[in-house]
Regions:
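Hydrophobic anchor residue at the start of the ABC signature
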Residues: 155
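Conserved ABC ATPase "signature" region
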Residues: 108, 112, 119-136, 189
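Catalytic Walker B motif of ABC-type/P-loop ATPase nucleotide-binding domains
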Residues: 166-169
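Helix-to-loop junction immediately C-terminal to a conserved catalytic motif
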Residues: 64
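Conserved signature/switch motifs of ABC ATPase nucleotide-binding domains
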Residues: 140-143, 161
């Protein structure tokens, strides 16, 4: 039996934020993540889903090294994560492209600290723009691009540093439904062509099933793994409207909804915020 390589290992991660209570209120501690553990295997897409406030984005930023965890370990290719690094690419919800740079120059941005020549940077950026379907848009500036095109540039920029794992924080949530489905298909195509490992945060149940090999459902704050669901559909997959009619798709979606609905019940005692008495 073939052993799958663990690309990302999250083990016992916890995070608490201190919240300022205001002029007449005490500060308090907010437990966001509690002993959260899971693995992501090489070449797979894993989605994180759960109700708002369960810590999905916080976890992604901890993995990226933008926020310190309070407890637990994170490893990428067996190397501990101690801060930001080139082994992790981050795709934000908003493209946040530099408005004074062309699409190609935005993609080149992450390469400028790697000692590559101008020609090498330009060639790699052009290849990535072609990969995301924008081969002829390299000289256009962000204000000349649609929202969907800007997100393609955002993805190409994250891929430019050739990360071991791609972290995607609701990258399609601000797009209209049609553009969203187009980019979901594009993500699967790009994943197939690059064999990248992806950790994908979304609120959309259908999107989570469609793009993923597995879906991790997080419980309400403090976030922890409630259940990990396998998505058995092989790649390449039919378009999402067609897949929605599959009974297996419907069963997975129903189970995800049940788990999230359970999390919306009154909070567990350990999820209640704690007064800091500072």
């Amino acid at each position: 039996m073939e052993t799958r390589k663990v690309k990302l290992a999250v083990d016992g991660v916890s995070k608490t934020f201190r919240v300022r209570g205001g002029k007449y209120q005490e500060d308090y501690l907010l437990n966001v993540l509690r002993r959260l553990s899971f693995d992501v295997y090489e070449g797979e897409v894993v989605s994180l889903i759960g109700e708002s406030g369960c810590g999905k984005t916080t976890l992604l930023r901890i993995i990226q090294g933008l926020i310190r965890r309070d407890a637990g370990t994170i490893r990428v290719d067996e190397r501990p994560v101690t801060g930001p690094g080139r082994d992790r690419g981050y795709v934000f919800q908003q493209a946040n492209l530099l408005p004074w740079r062309s699409a190609r120059a935005n993609v080149e941005f992450g390469l400028e600290l790697q000692g590559l020549s101008s020609r090498e940077r330009g060639d790699r950026a052009q290849r990535l723009l072609e990969l995301v379907g924008l081969g002829k848009a390299g000289e256009q500036f962000p204000h000349q691009l649609s929202g969907g095109m800007q997100q393609r540039v955002n993805l190409a920029r994250a891929l430019a540093i050739d990360p071991a794992i791609l972290l995607m924080d609701e990258p399609f949530s601000a797009l209209d439904a049609q553009t969203r489905e187009v980019l979901q298909r594009e993500l699967l195509r790009i994943k197939s062509e690059t064999a990248k490992t992806v950790l994908f945060v979304t609120h959309d149940l259908d999107e989570a099933i469609y793009v993923s090999n597995r879906v991790i459902v997080l419980g309400a704050r403090p976030g922890r793994v409630k259940e990990i669901l396998d998505v058995p559909f092989s790649f390449p997959r039919p378009d999402l409207p067609e897949l929605r009619g599959d009974p297996t798709f419907q069963n997975i979606r129903r189970r995800m909804w049940e788990l999230i609905r359970e999390s919306s019940a009154p909070a567990r005692p350990e999820a209640v915020v704690e007064r800091a008495h500072l």
